[in-house]
Amino acid sequence: MESPEEPGASMDENYFVNYTFKDRSHSGRVAQGIMKLCLEEELFADVTISVEGREFQLHRLVLSAQSCFFRSMFTSNLKEAHNRVIVLQDVSESVFQLLVDYIYHGTVKLRAEELQEIYEVSDMYQLTSLFEECSRFLARTVQVGNCLQVMWLADRHSDPELYTAAKHCAKTHLAQLQNTEEFLHLPHHLLTDIISDGVPCSQNPTEAIEAWINFNKEEREAFAESLRTSLKEIGENVHIYLIGKESSRTHSLAVSLHCAEDDSISVSGQNSLCHQITAACKHGGDLYVVGGSIPRRMWKCNNATVDWEWCAPLPRDRLQHTLVSVPGKDAIYSLGGKTLQDTLSNAVIYYRVGDNVWTETTQLEVAVSGAAGANLNGIIYLLGGEENDLDFFTKPSRLIQCFDTETDKCHVKPYVLPFAGRMHAAVHKDLVFIVAEGDSLVCYNPLLDSFTRLCLPEAWSSAPSLWKIASCNGSIYVFRDRYKKGDANTYKLDPATSAVTVTRGIKVLLTNLQFVLA
């Protein structure tokens, strides 16, 4: 008589008789094999697409897998479902070649001169990922010369992110646009949306409205009253704060700067702070600083009244931590830093502005201090700083840590920064501009996981120990961390063209900058 099997024995024995084998690389290998047959050996083409006289030998299966437009075409009762040759009229041959490259290879070289056509055609052919990337590219490169055209385009394609970027450019450069053909032919509803969104007084929006009406007065006079009623003018606000010290004083100073569109920068205010500022950020129109004789204390400077108010202190003392504003949650996050015992911290806490309360949340993957921080769509990018080595001594860090404020989860990017140690960062659209020790200025694109090193003027070759950076009015401003008294020259970088201009003659008392906030 056979003895009963012990639990789990039959599974072990059956392993030698039969089992299910799952090849985890099978799907990828099949896809590679199909694409090799289609591309390298040019086999099994079953449809010819004719564009401007050029014929593309393609595959219905591949086109349908990537595009709902082609899938519907080939599975419908239309003649295109059965025809061997299909003629497309709404796309140029060069742009269709780019679409074919994308559909078959997953890569495409986007060129500025063809970008708007690729944007429109990728939406028409329902290539969603390509359409979204074109939208991001257009939003990054929108400028005075094309903002109205891009705004019109985004409106037609129901693209709110691109529309907002183009509208912001239009309303802040309205004085330059008001006599252009694009502005004078602008549809009424787009003009209304621009002027009702808050146009700076310096852009003379009333003159722009009159110019638009007078271009076709007979038909547009009826809109005059509604346009004047819709107009919302806003004053010029302070955009950048410098926090630092004068060589002869121990107290920190907060200097507010007004950055005008004509590249001029003027000092619009100055306030005395406490002895030692350990962290600072700008949230909305207010300035928040942490430090003083008790390092956990926090103050807010109300920009409207220029009064300092005490806020709830941090739960514990921290030095060299990073403060980052997250407007979408109306919160300020404090990340990393050092304890008073000089131990690196991986703590993350956030301050709910409306409730005046600090709350602890999950920790960083790696404890760091003195890192640069940048908020991009609710994700905080913590860049560089100092971390512990294997012997628990500190070393310059090249890590990029990403803290998601929606999920309260942190992860470290699988790649590192092109430089290490202390750095400063500013967000422009969906890019992070990073300046480090020496003459390094890098544009980091988190969506593409790419870095671009920017060319800088020769003046940067004699760089100080560290530069500071801020994003304001669609430009990147770069400041020295040390100045001679009364010498506060700064550089202004246009992200769209990489052109650099120098702003001279800012009269401030600061000789040592600690923070630059925008």
UniProtKB/Swiss-Prot annotation:
Ranges where the BACK domain occurs: 147-239
Keywords carried by this UniProt record: Kelch repeat, Repeat
Matches recorded under InterPro entries: BACK, BTB-kelch_protein, BTB/POZ_dom, KBTBD4, KBTBD4_BACK, KBTBD4_BTB_POZ, Kelch-typ_b-propeller, Kelch_2
Subunit structure: Component of the BCR(KBTBD4) E3 ubiquitin ligase complex, at least composed of CUL3, KBTBD4 and RBX1.
Keyword rRNA processing among UniProt keywords: no
Gene transcribed to yield this protein: KBTBD4
Residues covered by the BTB domain: 45-112
Protein name, as recorded: Kelch repeat and BTB domain-containing protein 4
Domain of life: Eukaryota
CDD domains, A to Z: BACK_KBTBD4, BTB_POZ_KBTBD4
Stretches forming Kelch repeats: 239-285, 286-328, 331-378, 380-430, 432-481
Pfam family for this entry, one: Kelch_2
Function as written in the Swiss-Prot or TrEMBL entry: Substrate-specific adapter of a BCR (BTB-CUL3-RBX1) E3 ubiquitin ligase complex which targets CoREST corepressor complex components RCOR1, KDM1A/LSD1 and HDAC2 for proteasomal degradation. RCOR1 is likely to be the primary target while degradation of KDM1A and HDAC2 is likely due to their association with RCOR1. Also targets RCOR3, MIER2 and MIER3 for proteasomal degradation as well as associated proteins ZNF217 and RREB1. Degradation is dependent on the presence of an ELM2 domain in the target proteins.
